[in-house]
Amino acid sequence: MQEKIQRAQGCLLGQLVGDALDSLVEFLPPQMIHKKYPNGVRKLEDGGTWDTIPGQPKDDSEMALLLARYLVKTSTYNAKAMQNANLFWLNSQPFDCGVTIASALLGRKNPNSQANGALMRISPLGILGTNYPLATVENWAIQDAQLTHPNPVCLQANALMARAIAEAINQNTDAKTLFIKIKHWAQALAVDDLLLQAIEESEIAPPKDYITQQGWVIIAFHNMLWQLQHAWEQFMALRPFLNNG
């Protein structure tokens, strides 16, 4: 049980640390990042794009923490309650908020957007999912994405990610086995061809371009799968995104 708790803690801390490190370089061109951080972005510091303090969450992690607090309180998921919580967060005037999320929370969902905002906040639901059947976790993850990112690609990416997190924490699944399970789940769910392509390509290469369509859920999903299979430690998994702003 203690090891399971540690895996859950590592998942949430990984989200928060990665997001806080990214705040130092978000939207900067790769050349500027390399000049400023020749050895990579490794230390939590103040400053950056949003002049944050060391370790301060950005919008994605603020929403993830909001979700985490609700799940700790209730031990279940309720889409209406999270819609209200997300509106509370938006009305708190966060220093940043994605366009897709802001529009959706103000009643103007964009069904064409394939942005990664829903995927970026889903880790707490995967953690809670260790206590529930994977089908339940999947359904909750889809409901949560539907609040802000109703495009089918976003819904399906959320479902696969939440399943993977719950499975990895609950079963201590090794990377190779987890990838095979993700591939099987994707086929069983008949996910969009873009996701299937990302899964196939992730076996042999990382995303070709992190910049041109920055914020696209397919790039985030593809990179996650590549790092799952090939990164030998945590910083190596974060480096591609951090080096590309």
Describe each region flagged by the PLM.
Residues 1-245:
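Structured, active/binding-site neighborhoods that engage oxygen-rich ligands
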